[in-house]
């Protein structure tokens, strides 16, 4: 029971004291505001300077507009001064030391942001002021400020920015209102980190400026924000794509010319870099200060333009063909002989360890397989062996006769004639050819017959001659001689001594079809030689183009790498 009574008495006493404090605060406010004017500077002597202490707390960096060069910040501004007309004896007011009243009831210094860039004019916030019994007034005011900031984007995205916030009295000179710094720098204890900028300090400096319009000094306090851009976002979204795309320009030289996509690749890369360049240009201020990333894009675009131009030039070389002049001697020595080895440009199946004697030429000299020389010698003897010719060979050489473009088999028709022609030039058989077996039934099948005395004899094997490529140097016949797939008019003999009329082997029987077949082979070989010479000339130009492609590919790789290292290294 006593406890309840005690608690009730304490609560009543607290209520009485609180109501007493409220009555004294109301009485104090009425006494202070009596005959008080907020329009006049609160000093007892008008010649005396009123000191105002300014302290800035940076809460947040809301935005940095590089294009318009405007910095938006969220600040807490604290101003402290002494009002000579707002003092009281705290003992007269029941020990009341502090009251909080609206700021519009008291005089406030007209301290503003000099480099304000806000389009809308806004006055100070009407927050309460804290009034102490000794006349000290503290005014805490939040403010979202937009200040002009000279942005230097030369080192974008590795740039530092120094933005100033200058505060001073707009109408009072230094003899009337003096501004002092509450701290040597801005307060960053409550700073909220920004996703794009890092704040590395906010030093303050007090300046006294003499303007040309006035003879009195005007003090101000300038806070300098040290901002560093967070570059990781721009590295992954602007620099790295550009770096990777720039390496596609040299790879355009490695793309085969026959693919038809070399120029398309260069143009596509150029368009991609143009898009990235526009993205950078839209975010940068239109000034003479070009960022290094912009220079990097321009340099890369220049290199891609040059590589595309060189690609067009090299493709013209690649597709020179037979109509072009032969490759100059200096180009063969410099490009084909030396540069191709340095740049490791070899034909299919070759490498840097292949001996010179084993390397495949641009086009094979013989259209035959590995043992072409041996086969040529054997067939050479087959047709003109020991200067003789068998009559049955003349007929066996043409088991099929061309007639009006159709093939007709005459094997059975000439069978009797073949029997009569056996051993026309002697009955012996060359042992060199008797050992050949399993050949074509028109050329290598042994024939047997009964001779005088009843003994069984073998007719000689058919001997054919293979015309070597070196023996077929002649002039191409006119197209008019070609009818129904063969030659109807006689052709001149080749110019080589092996096939001239004087040295040609004589046949005991006239064989015009045999001679016509030889002439047809000569014409086909001549066409093949001309085609091979044309292909060889085009192949030389193609190899020149391939070596130049490989040379410019490495040159551009080195240039892109060095340019990237120099520009990025200088920017960082």
Swiss-Prot record:
It is found in: Postsynaptic cell membrane; Cell membrane. Glycans are attached at residues 51, 164. Residues 318-550 are cytoplasmic. Residues 1-19 form the signal peptide. Its main location: membrane. Expressed in the liver, olfactory mucosa, pituitary gland, hair cells of the saccule and spleen. The chain crosses the membrane at residues 233-253, 263-283, 297-317, 551-571. Residues 20-232 are extracellular. Gene3D superfamilies: Neurotransmitter-gated ion-channel ligand-binding domain (2.70.170.10), Neurotransmitter-gated ion-channel transmembrane domain (1.20.58.390). Belongs to the ligand-gated ion channel (TC 1.A.9) family. Acetylcholine receptor (TC 1.A.9.1) subfamily. NCBIfam families: LIC. This is Neuronal acetylcholine receptor subunit alpha-9-I. The gene is nachra9.
